[in-house]
From Swiss-Prot:
Protein name: Long chain base biosynthesis protein 2a
Reactions this protein catalyses: L-serine + hexadecanoyl-CoA + H(+) = 3-oxosphinganine + CO2 + CoA
Disruption outcome: No visible phenotype. Lcb2a and lcb2b double mutant is not viable due to pollen lethality.
Location of this chain's protein in the cell: Endoplasmic reticulum membrane
Cofactor (UniProt): pyridoxal 5'-phosphate
UniProt source species: Arabidopsis thaliana (Mouse-ear cress)
Superkingdom of origin: Eukaryota
Subunit description: Heterodimer with LCB1. Component of the serine palmitoyltransferase (SPT) complex, composed of LCB1 and LCB2 (LCB2a or LCB2b).
Similarity remark: Belongs to the class-II pyridoxal-phosphate-dependent aminotransferase family.
InterPro entries listed in its UniProt record: Aminotrans_II_pyridoxalP_BS (IPR001917), Aminotransferase_I/II_large (IPR004839), AON_synthase_class-II (IPR050087), PyrdxlP-dep_Trfase (IPR015424), PyrdxlP-dep_Trfase_major (IPR015421), PyrdxlP-dep_Trfase_small (IPR015422)
GO CC terms, sorted: endoplasmic reticulum; endoplasmic reticulum membrane; membrane; vacuole
Keyword line: Acyltransferase, Apoptosis, Endoplasmic reticulum, Lipid metabolism, Membrane, Pyridoxal phosphate, Sphingolipid metabolism, Transferase, Transmembrane, Transmembrane helix
Other facts: The lcb2a-1 mutant is incapable of initiating programmed cell death (PCD) after induction by fumonisin B1 (FB1), a specific inhibitor of ceramide synthase.
């Protein structure tokens, strides 16, 4: 739970109030212009309504240049950011031919597989030559190749479940699978900060949805107990099925799930555990096998294991791992498997090769080195940010580090100044976060050198001073005692 300092909350509310007031004033004068110039869309219902339309026009457009920045190179430790300009107050942004070489603190390239790799890339190129860029078919038609079969076997072995099925899109893995697993008469109990794909999948299922306080097992147990006692709405019949949905690492918080407690509670109340490991698989654990390995949880106690290949593996798509009966059922029922084009074969080969590197099956210890480096880099960077006085969310070992900004004016200030000093960061505000909880989300990679991280820390510290986001006092710097100093008894 984030506790906002009182003065920070007041100043943030004041900033939003000021933006709202000026926006309303501009809209007032805009009515006269709209009246004078007739529109070709008279009689059409507006696409955006009310406050959503107002927010986009009067708040988001002001800082639109801080989002969706195009890049023109691989998402390595350093990449090329395309420069843009606007002639209409950020309503439209146009690309230039100029690029800026920036330190990449925004990509999910946790293990550094997002760029050229001496083991993965040649095999991906060979796969492209043999199978082409797309299968042009769904898995149940002509879209299953030998590479897809090998990938599912590889994932099964890596995550420690009896079977697995892969999909071409990580987001769709959640949003398409959950409605197949549960429907009307079922109960989904979801963490309050679960990803949008989980939220949309739960809403589309038709099941009753209840939310428990973020990463709070005691509240989860209370909700479970109450819902089991009450039963289904109106009829009070027992629930047909109960699924508890949590994430391994919460992408906007950088926090690691209290999985052992969640599993124990679900066992007690006979509820299924659905674990989303989008950000944790491959990135944490001694051998990269995710939160179960990190926290010592038996994978047999997690009923449905979901993950994506877009982060640690440098590819695309997602997977579901579980019992053989579950996977067979999903292959016959899930629309994402039946109707969507299968994951591109070169992308599947990239995942297989990355897993082999992580497991050391490439004949080297590069996988172990990458895992040690991402852990070392993450803990070093987090500790240094906290020493500087930033409010940093998340837990140790997590490569995701949100730095709290709060005030809406500090979103563009932090983003633009960092970019000006050749450090590319991701900033996040409403509606992706609550209104008062804007933040910058730092993602650390194994491809970052210690020199890269020190340079980034210097820039972020300087920008933090300029924008006033060091909400805690910095630790005093330790002065090393010179050998020539005279010690007085």
């Amino acid at each position: 739970m984030i506790t906002i300092p009182y003065l920070t909350a007041v100043s943030t509310y004041f900033s939003y109030g000021l933006l709202f007031a000026f926006g309303q004033l501009r809209d007032f004068f805009r009515r006269f212009i709209d009246w004078w110039f007739t529109s070709n869309l008279q009689g059409y219902a507006p696409i955006c309504l009310g406050h959503e339309d107002f927010y986009i026009r009067r708040l988001y457009h002001r800082i639109q240049d801080c989002f969706e920045r195009p890049i023109s190179s691989a998402p390595d430790a350093w990449f090329d950011v395309v420069e843009r300009y606007s002639n209409d107050n950020n309503k439209t942004l146009k690309r230039t031919t100029k690029t800026s070489r920036c330190l990449n603190l925004g990509s999910y390239n946790y293990l550094g597989f997002g760029s050229f790799d001496e083991y993965c890339t040649p095999r991906v190129i060979e796969s492209l030559k043999k199978f082409s860029a797309s299968t042009c078919s769904s898995r149940v038609d002509a879209g299953t190749t030998s590479v897809h079969a090998e990938l599912e076997e590889c994932v099964t072995r890596f995550v420690g479940k009896p079977a697995a099925v892969v999909f071409g899109m990580g987001y769709a893995t959640n949003s398409a699978i959950i409605p197949v697993l549960i429907g009307k008469g079922g109960l989904i109990i979801s963490d309050s900060l679960n990803h949008s794909s989980i939220v949309n999948g739960a809403r589309g299922s038709g099941a009753t949805i209840r939310v428990f306080q973020h990463n709070t097992p005691s509240h989860l147990e209370r909700v479970l107990r109450e819902q089991i006692a009450e039963g289904q709405p109106r009829t009070h019949r027992p629930w047909k099925k109960i699924i508890v949905v949590v994430e391994g690492i919460y992408s906007m918080e950088g926090e690691i799930c209290h999985l052992p407690e969640v599993v124990a509670i679900c066992k007690k109340y006979k509820a299924y555990v659905y674990l989303d490991e989008a950000h944790s698989i491959g990135a944490i654990g001694k051998t990269g096998k995710g939160i179960c390995e990190l926290l010592g949880v038996d994978t047999a106690d997690v009923d449905v294991m979901m993950g994506t290949f877009t982060k640690s593996f440098g590819s695309c798509g997602g997977y579901i791992a579980g019992s053989k009966e579950l996977i067979q059922y999903l292959k016959h029922q899930c629309p994402a498997h039946l109707y969507a084009t299968s994951i591109p074969t070169p992308s599947a080969q990239q995942i297989i090769s990355a897993i082999k590197v992580i497991l050391g099956e490439d004949g080297s210890n590069r996988g172990a080195q990458k895992l040690a480096r991402i852990r070392e880099n993450s803990n070093f960077f987090r500790a240094e940010l906290q020493k500087m006085g930033f409010e940093v969310l998340g837990d140790n070992d997590s490569p995701v580090m949100p730095i709290m900004l709060y005030n809406p004016a500090k979103i563009p200030a932090f983003s633009r100044e960092c970019l000006r000093q050749k450090v590319a960061v991701v900033v996040v505000g409403f509606p992706a976060t609550p209104l008062l909880l804007a933040r910058a989300r730092i993602c650390i990679s194994a491809s970052h050198s210690r020199e890269d991280l020190i340079r980034a820390l210097k820039v972020i510290s300087k920008v933090g001073d300029l924008s006033g986001i060091k909400y805690f006092p910095a630790e005093p710097k330790k002065i090393e005692q010179s050998k020539n100093d005279i010690k007085l008894d």
